[in-house]
């Protein structure tokens, strides 16, 4: 077979029946990664470690004692999560030679469940982008592209584009992404897979190299909602190494209902998401699914999130302020890239950062430092914090009326690379993250699910958002939609 067509749950059953074994699956995955190198999804492949983990998994299955449903399942990890003994670069020259001495908590937990880590995936440098094009390893190509040569390919979305393509192209079963303003859901939408941003604090950020501490969340990328639930079960829960995780234990999500009743489920349609730039086919898809939900017994009603128009500006200000703070640790002295020009401490510091960061990162640092100047602090940063609270309050009011919000994930299908690069990074993110970043501002869970193909044969996806810690309900509704549209069976 050229792809990995099975769900993790079905794969686990195959392992149990001995019709497949983990070593064969990992060997197939490694072969697929090699044959799809032109997509540039992976920046590093951990073949030896993966085969070693696969052999251990096979031994457990042979003894009928697998660790979990994920035992032997191939997983990719975005290259901003620390992996012990494996380079973690954030796709930046600044960390090009960084080899962590520990695993991120989410990586550690997946391996504790028997998952096999096959490699690290591409991203925009330090996660700053929405196209997966600003990387020292070059851009990632969307596997749905009509043409993957030169600059005629479709972008994968970002910043977790490598993880999205790895799953969509069948190179692995699932992948870790990170989500600060849509970096898991945006590429999931463009690549036709499922992308979950959990509630802030539900999944540990320990070992995730920070971009925006108050919004960063580890994301989950899979081909089906059921696999997404299995991944969440493995990684969610409190962590002593991350003080922002909630202290209560995570209640595992049981296998999702195949025939869920929508009676009594209240679906909200935010009127502000019907915005400029929303493509006709995306709007039509949104309408069709809303009608489908209503026909199945759900109550569908319009709701208002009045501060949505301000959200992208507030997100941009807060993002750049936290970036300026987080990037200040890279000075060429403690770790990371070190310039050869070290005639003085100031010269070393300046040259290290000039050489180590790309233009996008430097621009965000510059903007963030400007907003944080004493004369600008109240005018920009403090005001942005106040509006962020208003945005969060919009969601609080909305979830008193409805259980789930249904919106587009992105305003369009995946753009062509040659068109995408005509805009600067800030303008790109303002368009690509319009529908996704409000969930990060409010800290609520959101999931992108593929619905159908456009007239250009490219994926169109929709997003569901729920109140804090309602992942179970969110996944149930997403699973119901997935069963109706059957994207995997129809288009994969």
UniProtKB/Swiss-Prot annotation:
GO cellular component: glutamyl-tRNA(Gln) amidotransferase complex; mitochondrion
Enzyme Commission no: 6.3.5.7
Chief location: mitochondrion
Described purpose of this protein according to its UniProt entry: Allows the formation of correctly charged Gln-tRNA(Gln) through the transamidation of misacylated Glu-tRNA(Gln) in the mitochondria. The reaction takes place in the presence of glutamine and ATP through an activated gamma-phospho-Glu-tRNA(Gln).
SUBUNIT field: Subunit of the heterotrimeric GatCAB amidotransferase (AdT) complex, composed of A, B and C subunits.
Similarity field: Belongs to the amidase family. GatA subfamily.
Name by which UniProt lists this protein: Glutamyl-tRNA(Gln) amidotransferase subunit A, mitochondrial
Lineage: Eukaryota, Metazoa, Ecdysozoa, Arthropoda, Hexapoda
């Amino acid at each position: 077979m050229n792809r990995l067509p099975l769900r993790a749950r079905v794969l686990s059953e195959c392992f149990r029946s001995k019709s497949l074994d983990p070593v064969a699956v990992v060997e197939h995955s490694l072969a697929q990664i090699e044959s799809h190198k032109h997509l540039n999804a992976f920046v590093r492949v951990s073949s030896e470690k993966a085969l070693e983990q696969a052999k251990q998994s096979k031994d457990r299955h042979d003894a009928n004692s697998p660790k979990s449903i994920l035992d032997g399942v191939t997983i990719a990890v975005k290259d901003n999560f620390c992996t012990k003994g494996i380079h973690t670069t954030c796709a930046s020259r600044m960390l090009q030679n960084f080899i962590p001495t520990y695993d991120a908590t989410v990586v550690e937990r997946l391996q504790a469940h028997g998952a096999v880590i096959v490699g690290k995936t591409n991203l925009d440098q330090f996660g700053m982008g929405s196209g997966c094009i600003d990387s020292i390893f070059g851009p990632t190509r969307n596997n749905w592209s009509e043409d993957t040569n030169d600059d005629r390919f479709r972008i994968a979305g970002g910043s977790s584009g490598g993880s999205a393509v790895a799953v969509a192209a069948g190179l692995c079963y699932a992948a870790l992404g990170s989500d600060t303003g849509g970096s898991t859901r945006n590429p999931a939408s463009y690549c036709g897979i499922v992308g979950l941003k959990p509630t802030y604090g539900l999944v540990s950020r320990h070992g995730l190299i920070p971009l925006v501490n108050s919004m960063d969340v580890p994301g989950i990328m899979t081909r089906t909602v059921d696999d997404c639930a299995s991944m969440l079960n493995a990684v969610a829960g409190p962590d002593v190494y991350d003080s922002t995780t909630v202290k209560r234990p995570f209640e595992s999500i049981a296998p999702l209902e195949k025939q869920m009743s929508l009676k009594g489920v209240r679906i909200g349609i935010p009127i502000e998401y019907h915005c400029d730039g929303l493509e006709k086919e995306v709007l039509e898809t949104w309408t069709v699914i809303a009608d489908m939900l209503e026909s199945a017994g759900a109550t569908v009603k319009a709701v208002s999130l009045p501060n949505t128009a301000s959200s992208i500006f507030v997100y941009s200000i807060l993002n750049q302020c936290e970036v300026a703070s987080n990037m200040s640790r890279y000075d060429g002295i403690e770790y990371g890239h070190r310039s050869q020009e070290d005639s003085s401490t100031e010269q070393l510091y300046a040259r290290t950062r000039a050489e180590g960061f790309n233009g996008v990162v430097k621009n965000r640092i510059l903007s963030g430092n400007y907003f944080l100047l004493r004369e600008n602090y109240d005018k920009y940063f403090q005001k942005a914090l106040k509006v962020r609270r208003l945005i969060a309050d919009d969601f609080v009011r909305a979830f008193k009326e409805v259980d789930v919000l249904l919106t587009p994930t992105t305003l369009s299908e995946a753009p062509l690379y040659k068109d995408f690069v005509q805009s600067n990074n800030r303008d790109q993110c303002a368009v690509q993250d319009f529908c996704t970043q409000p969930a990060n501002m409010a800290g609520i869970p959101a999931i992108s699910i593929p619905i159908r193909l456009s007239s250009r044969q490219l994926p169109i996806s929709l997003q569901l958002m729920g109140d804090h810690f309602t992942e179970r309900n969110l996944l149930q509704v997403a699973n119901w939609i997935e069963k109706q549209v059957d994207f995997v069976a129809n288009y994969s």
